[in-house]
């Protein structure tokens, strides 16, 4: 779907996505269906970046996304449950490492509320992981993100001056810098 925003096209998710797991289950080489679908986009160089927001599950659709990816940004909530999910994701990635060449670009700490100690604890625990990049940028809890999601607009369109809009722009610069290494 072309959007009114420069350099931004979207394929929106819908309730039909829940059928994908079922349909993939019956396919041969089901882990590579998305990669095959994206091949022509890569070959034609239509986009500089294709970002896929994966659901917080570890099923066949997520395996498809990881098999199609060159890099993975792993979001982790600044909360006790966020770290639990991160450990599960690393175990999952190790388990499918023979299927995918995706590399972890970095861990992005999200939903940071500096009134709580979780951000600091999360950062300290992540520092203990060898060879895992933790993005310098982190994303604060911000009601403007919820408003933008609810109204289907980028947060930078809703309010360019919000903290979260600036944080997402800073993250984009970090991602582009990583890609130019």
Residue ranges and their predicted role:
Residues 16-17, 141-145:
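Active-site/binding-pocket entry motifs
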Residues 13, 137, 141, 160:
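Active-site donor-binding loop signature of nucleotide-sugar glycosyltransferases
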Residues 170-181:
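C-terminal alpha-helix
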Residues 1-58:
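Cytosolic-facing regulatory segments adjacent to core modules
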Residues 24, 34, 145, 155-158:
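Short clusters of hydrophobic/aromatic residues that line enzyme substrate/ligand-binding pockets
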Residues 149-167:
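C-terminal boundary of histidine-terminating zinc-finger modules
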Residues 33, 85-88, 167:
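Charged catalytic carboxylate motif
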Residues 39, 43-143:
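Conserved catalytic-core segment of NTP-binding enzymes
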């Amino acid at each position: 779907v072309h959007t009114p925003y420069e350099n931004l096209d979207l394929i929106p998710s819908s309730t039909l996505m829940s059928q994908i797991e079922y349909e993939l289950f019956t396919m041969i080489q089901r882990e590579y269906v998305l990669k095959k679908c994206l091949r022509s986009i890569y070959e034609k160089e239509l986009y500089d970046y294709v970002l896929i927001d994966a659901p917080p599950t570890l099923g066949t659709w997520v395996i498809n996304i990881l098999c199609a990816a060159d890099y993975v940004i792993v979001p982790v909530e600044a909360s006790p449950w966020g770290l639990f999910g991160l450990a599960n994701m690393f175990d999952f990635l190790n388990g499918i490492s023979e299927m995918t060449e995706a590399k972890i670009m970095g861990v992005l700490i999200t939903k940071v509320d500096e009134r709580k100690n979780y951000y600091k604890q999360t950062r300290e625990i992540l520092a203990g992981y060898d060879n895992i990049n933790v993005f310098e940028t982190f994303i604060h809890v911000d009601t403007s993100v919820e408003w933008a999601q609810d109204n289907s607009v980028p947060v930078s369109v809703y309010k360019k001056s919000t903290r979260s809009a600036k944080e997402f722009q800073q993250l984009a610069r970090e991602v582009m810098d990583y890609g130019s290494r």
